[in-house]
Amino acid sequence: MTKTAVVLLSGGLDSATVAAIAKREGYRVIALSFNYGQRHDRELRAAADIVQALGIPEHFSINLDLAQWGGSSLTDRQQTLPQTGVEPDIIPSTYVPGRNTVFIALGLSLAEAKGAEAVFLGINAIDYSGYPDCRPEYLATYQQLAALSSKVGVEGRPIQLLAPLIELSKVDIVHKALELGVPIAQTWSCYAGGEEPCGRCDSCRLRDQALIEAGHPELASAKGRLWREKVD
């Protein structure tokens, strides 16, 4: 019997890698993306490209205007995106209040409606340690809620929340993506709006550094490479 899983697919490197992992593990993948008012909505085109590249049969996209109330530099264009790198124990301004909690709830809804056994998430606690909704304890607590709040959970068949990258470094994720044939060049991680990665935002810096350390500087952003050359 074919297993089915919902994958929360942003269009970034992490979620694309998770989609490839789900496919390798034998799941029929249903992708779920969100247009939530993020300034980097370019990632939605990347999500569609990844769906095609990986041969994912179903892709849903939901509109959620979280930009209405702001609270994050990802949804409020009046705020400046951080460019100083991730700092331990500091929650960055790119944290979107309640975003993962809402996304996972909708992923669980889709999974239950489609008879899926799991929801795969691309959250990571190593490089994004400042995000409270990317921690293992957050995921474990949400798993309990998933079991209590759904028909299948009450019947003893709770939908599993799976985050295979949660304790991997960004370099390890790059290696995993390469191993699985993820089209890294088609993924999008930049937080800034535009058609080319800015190379300066925290997400670009983490991604580019990981690609360079993994031995693939050619996959790093062009602007990021130029900026690093000037700094060095």
From Swiss-Prot:
Function, as annotated: Catalyzes the ATP-dependent conversion of 7-carboxy-7-deazaguanine (CDG) to 7-cyano-7-deazaguanine (preQ(0)).
Name this protein carries in UniProt: 7-cyano-7-deazaguanine synthase
Organism domain of life: Bacteria
EC numbers: 6.3.4.20
Recorded catalytic activity of this chain's protein: 7-carboxy-7-deazaguanine + NH4(+) + ATP = 7-cyano-7-deazaguanine + ADP + phosphate + H2O + H(+)
Gene Ontology terms describing biological process: queuosine biosynthetic process
Keywords, ordered alphabetically: ATP-binding, Ligase, Metal-binding, Nucleotide-binding, Queuosine biosynthesis, Zinc
Organism: Synechocystis sp. (strain ATCC 27184 / PCC 6803 / Kazusa)
